């Protein structure tokens, strides 16, 4: 029986591992088949057509054959073509992109389809190719929110998680891993106002493509520096809680670079 072939699939390389002297194992995020593992035979050879193409944060179209039905199967890469459209991110934008890749590898199950999230990720990568510094913050926070909502790990942001009481617009609330969204305590370092949380929920809940949702959230966060800055540590704690140990490698690298 001939192996099933997936052709011209939109994809991004999340990570690559040495498999042999000449081959690589790839962790790839595809639009229609989710996160898949592929072996790229001969990709490390100087003459390989794969060599200049299989890079992170670059839009690809790939062809591969399925080696089985299990989620732990490693499939065989047969072709990869760079779609083009933007340059490779550099500096802090590159590190931010690798951080998002690590989140996807930690949080997405193998071969679970997330087409809308893929489209949002593609939009973020385009931003990373052209922006740096403070302009990245609202984009990263927005994608973190979309990712958590897509995989069912983000509570409703317009009610208190434990009581389902609607948020008071003028009150302050904190998002914490163990309790969800709750009234702020004096010990909380980062909180948002009820009106701000409710606006985020409205943006996430609108019946529109994730790319449009992403733009709406970015616009809301970019309107003021405070919401994005206050949201960052709360989302970071929630993401680390669900990613488990050890700390995200890209996050540790950011800490190490800041200490230099």
From Swiss-Prot:
Which of UniProt's keywords are assigned here? Answer: DNA damage, DNA recombination, DNA repair
Would the keyword Metal-binding be found if you checked this record's keyword annotation?
Answer: no
GO terms under cellular component: bacterial nucleoid
Pfam families linked? RecO_C, RecO_N
Biological process terms from the Gene Ontology for this record are:
DNA recombination; double-strand break repair
Instruction: Name the family.
Output: Belongs to the RecO family.
Q: Which HAMAP family does this one have?
A: RecO
Stated name of the protein? DNA repair protein RecO
Q: What is the lineage of its organism?
A: Bacteria, Pseudomonadati, Pseudomonadota, Betaproteobacteria, Burkholderiales
Q: Which gene encodes it?
A: recO
């Amino acid at each position: 029986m001939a192996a099933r072939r997936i052709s011209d699939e939109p994809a991004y390389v999340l990570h690559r591992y040495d498999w042999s002297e000449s081959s690589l194992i790839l962790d790839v995020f595809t639009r229609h088949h989710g996160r898949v593992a592929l072996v790229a035979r001969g990709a490390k050879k100087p003459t390989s057509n794969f060599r200049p193409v299989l890079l992170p944060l670059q839009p690809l179209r790939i062809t591969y054959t399925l080696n089985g039905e299990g989620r732990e199967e490693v499939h065989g890469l047969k072709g990869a073509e760079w779609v083009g459209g933007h340059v490779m991110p550099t500096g802090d934008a590159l590190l931010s992109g690798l951080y998002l890749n690590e989140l996807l590898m930690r949080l997405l199950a193998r071969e679970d389809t997330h087409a809308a999230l893929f489209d949002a990720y593609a939009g973020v990568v385009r931003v990373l190719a052209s922006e740096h510094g403070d302009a990245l913050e609202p984009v990263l926070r927005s994608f973190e929110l979309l990712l958590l909502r897509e995989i069912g790990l983000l509570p409703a942001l317009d009610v208190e998680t434990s009581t389902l009481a609607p948020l008071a617009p003028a009150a302050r609330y904190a998002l914490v891993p163990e309790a969800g969204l709750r009234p702020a305590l004096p010990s909380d370092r980062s909180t948002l106002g009820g009106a701000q949380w409710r606006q985020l929920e409205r943006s996430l809940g609108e019946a529109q493509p994730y790319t449009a949702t992403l733009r709406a959230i970015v616009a809301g966060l970019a309107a003021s520096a405070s919401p994005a800055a206050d949201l960052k540590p709360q989302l970071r704690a929630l993401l680390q809680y669900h990613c488990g140990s050890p700390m995200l490698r890209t996050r540790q690298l950011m800490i190490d670079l800041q200490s230099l």
